Amino acid sequence: MGNWSRSAVVLGVSLMLSGTAMGSQQGGAASGGQQKIDTATKTFSVKLGATRLIYNPESAGATLAVINPQGYPILVQSKVYAEDKQGNAPFVVTPPLFRLDGNQQSRVRVVRTGGTFAPDRETLYWMCVTGVPPKADDVWGQDKDGKSQAPKVATLEVQLRINSCIKLMVRPSSLKGDPADVATSMTWTREGSKLKASNPTPFFMNLKELSVGGKKVEGLEYVPPKGERTFTLPAGASGKVQWKVITDYGGDSREYQSALQ
């Protein structure tokens, strides 16, 4: 679940030749010379202005900053997914697709379109934003003079598109405070070689750190509200459980301690 927040997609391998490069290549072939073709791997991504969105279902929407760190324009695609990261969600993102110039920032707005949410706990969705690179013949990828801003040299290019996803937490207005305020309520139980985390609160507990007797627990995932999650105990682990959670602002909470039951 944590790894899904940034996933790479290989768009393809393309040979990009400008008119000048093509002419030089043809001329070189006639004279027995060879055109040098550069190879490059480019990663196209966007930076997001928050690590999570807290959405009040009674509000008019929530906004998120989107930054293009590349030096050329990209298309920005945005969509909200269900908790399983596959199904549709009762939200629309506006604009769903737009051009964002190089080294510029814009904002998208998430608006509820329907759905029924639990009144006594948070509901989780995923907000995903993807940057799409321009092709040589894309009109939207041209500068103000109508010139393409795609690479102008003969380049064998592998393009990697990065999906940037953050949690969208629907939090009813009846829930007050921050998950970090009640994270101490979590309990921990040994079940053989497993560690069961129980979360009696109405908030998702996004674990930042977890250890038992000073031994680090790997493979951390969130613990759902009024639910449980099981982790693998480190070999020989015993003693106190220590943990930290991620706050609403994306920072680390203080450290909590509890006895292992």
What are the functions of these language-model segments?
Residues 21-25, 29:
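Boundary at the C-terminal end of the N-terminal hydrophobic targeting segment
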Residues 30-65, 177-190:
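Beta-sheet-dominated interaction scaffolds and their linkers
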Residues 10-19:
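Bacterial N-terminal signal peptides
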Residues 115-182, 239-261:
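Terminal connector regions
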Residues 88-116, 215-240:
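Intrinsically disordered, low-complexity Pro/Gly/Ser/Thr-rich segments with frequent PxxP/GP/PP motifs
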Residues 66-70, 195-201:
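Asparagine-centered strand-capping/turn motif at beta-strand->loop junctions
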Residues 1-11:
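Bacterial N-terminal signal peptides that target proteins for export
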Residues 26, 47, 65, 69-111:
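Surface-exposed binding patches on compact interaction domains or structured appendages
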